[in-house]
Amino acid sequence: MLSRKATAVLLAVHAAAMLASQTEAFVPIFTYGEVRRMQEKERYKGQKKSLSVQQRSEEVGPVDPTEPWEEKQEVIKLTAPVEIGMRMNSRQLEKYQATLEGLLREVLPPSRNAQ
């Protein structure tokens, strides 16, 4: 049989888990300092990348503005099926229902039954 302390701890953990599943709040995983360091690293990478692009463009020479400029289009090919999903409780569904319906109308083609 479990001791009273163990039972109290398990009950507290269960209550915290139940409350966490019901809230919509954001729980930070990283501290403010860690986020700031990550942002600085990203900024540094961006500056480094823009410098290398600028150096390459200088090596190629000035671009003639009368020439047509082709934009590089990248296509991402998936090698495995991808499924994106989200879980909502009834309160969240009521709150975001109109927005979700609008997004689905934009993404999905009109069905023949709706006409």
UniProtKB/Swiss-Prot annotation:
Q: Which Pfam families match?
A: Motilin_assoc (PF04643), Motilin_ghrelin (PF04644)
Spell out the molecular function terms from Gene Ontology.
hormone activity; motilin receptor binding
Q: Does the keyword Nucleus apply?
A: no
Q: What highest taxon heads this organism's lineage?
A: Eukaryota
Disulfide bond annotation, renumbered to this chain? none
Q: What is its main location?
A: secreted
Q: Which UniProt keywords apply?
A: Cleavage on pair of basic residues, Hormone, Secreted, Signal
Question: Where are the annotated segments for Disordered?
Answer: 43-72
Which InterPro entries does the entry mention?
Answer: Motilin_assoc, Motilin_ghrelin, Promotilin
Where does the signal peptide begin and end?
1-25
Cell location:
Secreted
GO annotation, cellular component aspect: extracellular region
User: Which family is this sequence assigned to?
Assistant: Belongs to the motilin family.
Reported function: Plays an important role in the regulation of interdigestive gastrointestinal motility and indirectly causes rhythmic contraction of duodenal and colonic smooth muscle.
User: Which named protein is this?
Assistant: Promotilin
Q: Which organism is it from?
A: Bos taurus (Bovine)
* Gene name in the database record: MLN
